[in-house]
Amino acid sequence: AAARNLANATSFTQTQDGYLKSAQGTLDRMGELAIRAQDATLSPDQRALYQTEFQALKDTFNDTRTAEYNGQTLFDGTARTVASSPEDLAQLSGIDLFTAEQNAVTAQATRLNTPAQAQAALQDILTATDQLATARATTGSTLAELESASTRLTTQTESTTAAFSRISDTDVNEVMTRLSREQSLTQNNLFALKQLNSNQSHLIDLLG
């Protein structure tokens, strides 16, 4: 059961990390558009194209924030624990993509309609990007801890199995030794009884 728990926790965290990596790419592109949109020489049509793509990326980023794994929200900041062995619990740190800084990226007011808006949007994106980097560092650390816990569990299981095997082998050897000893005693007793009967017959013959 503990091994299954660790496998599920690893899958959960790997899924988090995959979404965070995708979100990083989304924010990088949004930042690039925000820089381009600060060009005051852009035509209205050019700026509109940037804004259209920017809005689509905002929607994509928002979809990432609400992503789920096995019915559980990945990025609501909830910390989780799983039994990593009969005695220990593994901690899954909560990743929160609904902070004020992350919310600013997807806010309706975050637009590229003017150079000033684009500059403000870029600052929000850079702050959100820093938070994503921290979140990915957290998932990386969690995955390393889960791998370590899995290795310890495997070692513990193998050691326990080997111990039981040695105990079982010892029990079998003791039983075989005892049976052999009892069989030898039985044979000796039978031989003594046979010898006694033979002596008695010989004595009777002498007396007769």
Describe each region flagged by the PLM.
Residues 1-155, 165-169, 187-208:
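Amphipathic alpha-helical coiled-coil/heptad-repeat segments
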Residues 174-181, 188:
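EAAAR-patterned alpha-helical heptad-repeat segments
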